[in-house]
Amino acid sequence: MSKAIVLDSHLKEKGSVELPKRYEGINSHNLYLYVKHYLSSARANTAKSKNRAEVSGGGRKPWAQKGGGRARAGSITSPVFVGGGVSHGATNNRNYNLKINKKQKRLALEYALEEKAQANKLFVVEKIAIKGVVEDNKRKHLTKEANQMFQALEQRDTLFVCMNMDEYTELAFSNLKKCLIIDVSELNAYLLAAFSSVVMEEAAFQHVVQDKTEE
């Protein structure tokens, strides 16, 4: 059974906690479906070309129907003219979103957590809190303290997951390129798969692994 590594206040390993048994044997296809859903939902539908009804001009017939030796033409907005409308071009009314049901979302999240635990990249700490130093009635050195925390983990990049994150902690991690800190309500399978390691507050971890199959 996969286990998450429990860290002490100095980010040193002090034990482990098992993931629920239901996390075993989940099909990886659920994660694939969720990643497709996540990326397609984020796709900006901005591609747009004008058809012959939308381009300007074309109010008169460009030349006489007969006698000129050229092919007949009724409007310069025709797609055969340079500057005319585009046939079968992109439209901005297309919906790229791919549907996925709640069960597949849950299974994708559980599979991603299981993968991190098997790779020994899932860590649990009691609290993630950055307070900094108060100078001149201002909190300073927030990012420095957050970076020290990240460096102590000795990981390539890290996703931090908090339960009820405070503004100072969020601000502290905002300038670190290889870190992202989120509230547990924002956690999803894509973010778990995108980062090489995950650090969760104990309360956030318990919230995520509680049985939601009855919901």
UniProtKB/Swiss-Prot annotation:
GO terms for cellular component: ribonucleoprotein complex; ribosome. Coiled coil: none annotated. One of its GO terms (biological process) is translation. Residues 56-71 have a biased composition (Gly residues). It holds the Pfam family Ribosomal_L4. One of its GO terms (molecular function) is structural constituent of ribosome. The keyword Hydrolase does not apply. Residues 46-72 are annotated as: Disordered. Keywords: Ribonucleoprotein, Ribosomal protein, RNA-binding, rRNA-binding. NCBIfam families: rplD_bact (TIGR03953). Part of the 50S ribosomal subunit. Belongs to the universal ribosomal protein uL4 family. This is Large ribosomal subunit protein uL4. It comes from Helicobacter pylori (strain Shi470). The lineage of its organism: Bacteria, Pseudomonadati, Campylobacterota, Epsilonproteobacteria, Campylobacterales. The gene is rplD.
